[in-house]
């Protein structure tokens, strides 16, 4: 592990040691006293609702050896006591201090750093790339989707004996990725796509493209891997002459182009031609977006000279975070749990996948698209048109804005009697229980904040099912859907159901 000496960085962070020894190493870091471990450094962040300085004593009790604070709330006696086991450092701004120390930490590592951004699929792309890189390197990667001004420095501060870093970068406004890339200093970057996420803040997809391209500002050379199927990235690729671009795609001819694509119920298959050789690939999750994720990971792996056979295995084996096109079969019904995030660009492929399934009704449960501001009506109406275009059998919407989806689906030819619009998850779950049958396919698609897990969980809440036949009775704990399946199989001409 490459360590940072507190004394050496004090001038850079404008730090004043209030107590304790300045000659200490900054190793593990924490911003939460509930999870801090002995020997770590505590950054007492100040937020809207709380000030981490209030928990500094707790951090020291749990073994913190350094605490950064931006307001001295301690008496001389308290500082004297704290200084026996920890060093308390006063800085102008704790968050800025974390950023500056992360920059120092990054400078100590001459390793591959792959940065990923995009409107849709950043986290799943990051997971596949990290899995591919792990075939050759000891990889540190962004945990979850901790991709902001706190998450990026914390990921970098987690570097120990790693020899590669895969880091995700998100943004809500222009200028944010510019700062993140200056912290991480990528050696290679990936842009998964340019869509409409956060368009309410940025005003247009073209402005979103500019904000995502800020990722180049932290690179010595502009080597970037881009999705050539995305209209704005494709256009930029043709116009830009300043950067080295590596392209991937399914529809547009690219350096890495997927061919013979087969989207199956439980994953994808495709062929990739490299130097006149054909290689077969599979992914665990279905849909174009996971093929594009795989292609970006293949491009990264080949850039770092990872053997193609190892890349094949890694792509097939890569685990993707929960609630992103999770396929589950229960009681002979197929559920597509895709409710981590939602945008026009992520909803379209989910609907296309649902449309391609056969047998039973194809039911789409869709919620409000968040963070789109004045573009809300337009984007929800475009989703409604996609629902009708994909011949979805039943549509259930949840939320005020999602009503634009339902109304537009009807305007585009979907039967009105097959569209149900609600404001709560309970209403949606109740209707779903009522209409669902054996063999149906159900897509649950929404942003995480819509809590669509409540709809899914509501289908499998346990009930008591009593069965009486010939004077003999039995009682069973079953889910609502299992109970319904049993009742549907009973011959109603022979038996009475109560």
Regions found by a protein language model. Give the residues of each.
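Short, basic phosphate-binding NTP loop
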Residues: 2-115, 124-131, 135, 150, ...
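Phosphate-binding loop of NTP-binding sites
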Residues: 8-11, 95-228, 233-243, 434, ...
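Residue-level signal for inorganic ion chemistry
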Residues: 9, 40, 59, 101, ...
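Acidic, Mg2+-coordinating active-site environments of NTP-dependent enzymes
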Residues: 12, 73-78, 82, 190-334, ...
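Nucleotide-activated donor-dependent transferases that construct or modify glycoconjugates
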Residues: 40, 464-473
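Active-site beta-alpha connecting loops in nucleotide-dependent enzymes
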Residues: 47-50, 321, 339-417
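Non-catalytic positions within long, well-ordered alpha-helices that form the structural scaffold/packing
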Residues: 56-61, 182, 355, 388
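Glycine- and acidic-residue-enriched helix-capping/strand-helix junction motifs
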Residues: 473-490
């Amino acid at each position: 592990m490459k360590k940072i000496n507190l004394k050496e960085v004090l001038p850079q962070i404008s730090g004043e040691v209030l107590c304790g020894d300045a000659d200490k190493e900054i190793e593990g870091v924490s911003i939460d006293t509930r999870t801090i471990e002995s020997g770590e450094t505590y950054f007492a962040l100040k937020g809207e609702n709380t000030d981490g300085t209030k928990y500094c004593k707790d951090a020291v009790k749990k073994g913190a050896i350094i605490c950064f604070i931006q307001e001295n709330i301690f008496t001389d006696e308290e500082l004297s006591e704290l200084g026996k086991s920890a060093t308390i450092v006063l800085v102008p701004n704790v968050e800025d201090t974390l950023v500056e120390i992360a920059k120092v930490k990054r400078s100590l590592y001459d390793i591959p750093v792959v940065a990923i951004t995009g409107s849709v699929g950043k986290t799943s792309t990051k997971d596949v790339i990290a899995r591919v890189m792990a075939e050759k390197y000891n990889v540190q990667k962004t945990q979850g989707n901790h991709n902001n001004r706190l998450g990026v420095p914390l990921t970098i501060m987690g570097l120990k004996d790693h020899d590669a870093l895969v880091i995700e970068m998100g943004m809500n406004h222009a200028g944010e990725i510019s700062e993140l890339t200056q912290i991480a200093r990528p050696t290679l970057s990936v842009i998964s796509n340019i869509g409409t996420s956060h368009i309410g803040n940025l005003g247009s997809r073209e402005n979103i493209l500019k904000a995502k391209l800020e990722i180049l500002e932290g690179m010595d050379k502009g080597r970037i891997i881009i999705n050539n199927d995305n209209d704005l990235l494709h256009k930029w690729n043709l116009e830009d002459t300043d950067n080295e671009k590596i392209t991937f795609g399914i529809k547009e001819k690219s350096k890495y182009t997927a061919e013979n694509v087969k989207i199956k119920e439980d994953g994808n298959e495709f062929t990739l031609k490299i130097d006149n050789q054909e290689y077969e690939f599979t992914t665990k999750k279905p849909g174009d977006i996971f093929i594009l994720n795989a292609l970006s990971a293949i491009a990264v792996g080949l850039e770092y000279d990872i053997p193609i056979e190892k890349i094949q295995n890694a792509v097939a084996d890569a685990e993707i975070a929960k609630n992103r096109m999770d396929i589950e079969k229960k009681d002979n019904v197929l559920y597509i749990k895709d409710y981590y995030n939602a945008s026009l660009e992520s909803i379209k492929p989910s609907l296309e996948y649902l449309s391609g399934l056969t047998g039973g009704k194809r039911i789409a449960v869709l919620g409000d698209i968040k963070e789109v501001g004045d573009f809300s009506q337009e984007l929800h109406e475009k989703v409604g048109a996609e629902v009708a275009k994909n011949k979805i059998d039943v549509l259930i919407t949840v939320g005020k804005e999602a009503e634009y989806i339902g109304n537009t689906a009807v305007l585009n030819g979907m039967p009105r009697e097959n569209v149900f619009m609600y404001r709560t998850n309970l209403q949606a779950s109740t209707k779903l229980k009522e209409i669902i049958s054996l063999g149906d396919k159900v897509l649950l698609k929404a942003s995480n904040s819509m809590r669509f897990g409540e709809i899914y969980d509501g289908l499998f809440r346990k009930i008591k099912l009593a069965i009486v036949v010939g004077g003999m009775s039995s009682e069973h704990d079953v889910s609502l859907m299992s109970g319904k399946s049993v009742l549907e199989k009973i011959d109603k001409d022979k038996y009475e159901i109560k």
